[in-house]
Amino acid sequence: MKKILALFTLLLLLAGCSAGAAPVMYIQPAELNEEEEAVAKLLGADTDQHLFDVVLDGTAKTVRVNTYVLEDGKWELVTGGGGTTLKEGEQKGRMAFGFEDLRGEYREAVQFGKDFTAVKYGSSEEIDDPEGTGRTASFLAGRTEIVYEREIPIAIQINTTKNQVLSYDLEYFFQPEEYEKLGYEHVYALTVMFSQEALS
């Protein structure tokens, strides 16, 4: 009986460890302290800015940020393809993204340790949409595991004249044909990817 009880306890312990194990490397919406919150509000970062905390294992060499447009059921690269070099051993950082419309001006900032990079893409010219065009976006809302060489969707934006807009979970980035079926005029995605490969 003691052997059965010990085996049962061991199984419970193993199941509990595997079910509750948090990812070692992850990206999640930033957890700001009061002072950071106040500064963010002062700078307008509580509007179209999205801040994320990043935890790595120290072996990442680059981070790539890409934007895509949905064309015929497939994602086509709009901006990105390059990347930002990370110093060896960096483990904690922050990323910020700011945009109203991914077709227009888009901003990104990457900070690891004392290194900081900020880039602006696109044009600030106003986009002429048909009357009645609406826009909605879904953003990464929880902790997401970082796997090297795998893109992580940060935002999906839909611009459409349709009255009803369905916005799927960000994991549907990997099934773009689902967005194509809905017939929206414009669907965009913003992703990040961490790599152990240096920029070439």
Where are these regions (language model features)?
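Residues in well-ordered beta-strands of folded domains
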Residues: 7, 53, 98
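Residue-level detector of functional hotspots within protein domains
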Residues: 3, 38, 176-178
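N-terminal export/targeting and maturation segments
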Residues: 19-88
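C-terminal motif of bacterial Sec signal peptides marking the signal peptidase cleavage site
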Residues: 13-16
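Low-complexity, intrinsically disordered regions enriched in charged/polar residues
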Residues: 7, 21, 26, 33, ...
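Extracytoplasmic electrostatic interaction patches
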Residues: 83-200
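Positively charged n-region of N-terminal signal peptides that target proteins for export
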Residues: 1-4, 8
